[in-house]
Regions:
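Positively charged, low-complexity terminal tracts
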Residues: 2-202
Length: 202
């Protein structure tokens, strides 16, 4: 299941990236997938609970370090974008993003997050975006359905505006999922050897 998540996340980001960026993002995806496959194979050969505990400790350190990186990373926002020969400012695009996010129906416990995200996009001093806000924006837009030529055009403008961010976002997302895959491999191997250990202890 996680493998499919990695592949679909990469394919979505890469398919939206400019052609000059696609090869770099795709190469990284292939390298990380190979790395994860090799790691899974290595973990599957381990029968020691202590060794798995050591690996998990190392993996959690890698996870914490990467979470710290994602917390600090910033993606510069373009001042404008061009679609069908017409220029649209960051403010124009932000208005379209806010419009689409505002169409999403949510229960009250999620409203504050949506409200704060829209406030962020509305800010005139908003010139760079962190990973969490970008990830939330893209995931929320992915939930939307678009009706009519006007909305279709507007989401295409938003996508065009986001293109300069896609490669780095794809790399950051892919690395994040790869770390989760490795940790998942450790958990699955532990689940396999613990019943065996319990039987031998009886």
């Amino acid at each position: 299941m996680i493998d499919k998540k990695l592949n679909s996340a990469v394919e979505e980001c890469v398919s939206n990236a400019p052609e000059t960026q696609e090869e770099n993002a795709q190469q990284m995806a292939e390298r990380l997938q190979k790395e994860v496959d090799e790691y899974k194979e290595m973990v599957s050969s381990i029968s020691s609970q202590e060794k798995l505990d050591e690996l998990e400790k190392e993996m959690m350190k890698e996870y914490d370090d990467y979470e710290a990186y994602l917390k600090d990373v910033r993606y510069p926002l373009p001042a404008s974008t061009t679609f069908e020969g017409k220029e649209f400012s960051k403010s124009d695009v932000a208005g379209k993003i806010i419009y689409f996010i505002s169409k999403i129906e949510q229960t009250w416990q999620y409203v504050l997050g949506l409200y704060e995200l829209c406030k962020l996009w509305k800010s005139p001093t908003f010139t760079e975006i962190n990973f969490g806000a970008l990830d939330s924006t893209l995931r929320l837009l992915d939930q939307c359905k678009f009706q009519g030529m006007s909305e279709w055009r507007d989401i295409l403008i938003v996508n065009e505006y986001m293109k300069p961010l896609h490669e780095q976002y794809a790399k950051d997302t892919t690395q994040h999922i790869a770390i989760a895959q490795k940790h998942d491999a450790i958990i699955k191997q532990r689940d396999l050897i613990e019943p065996v250990k319990s039987k031998t202890d009886k």
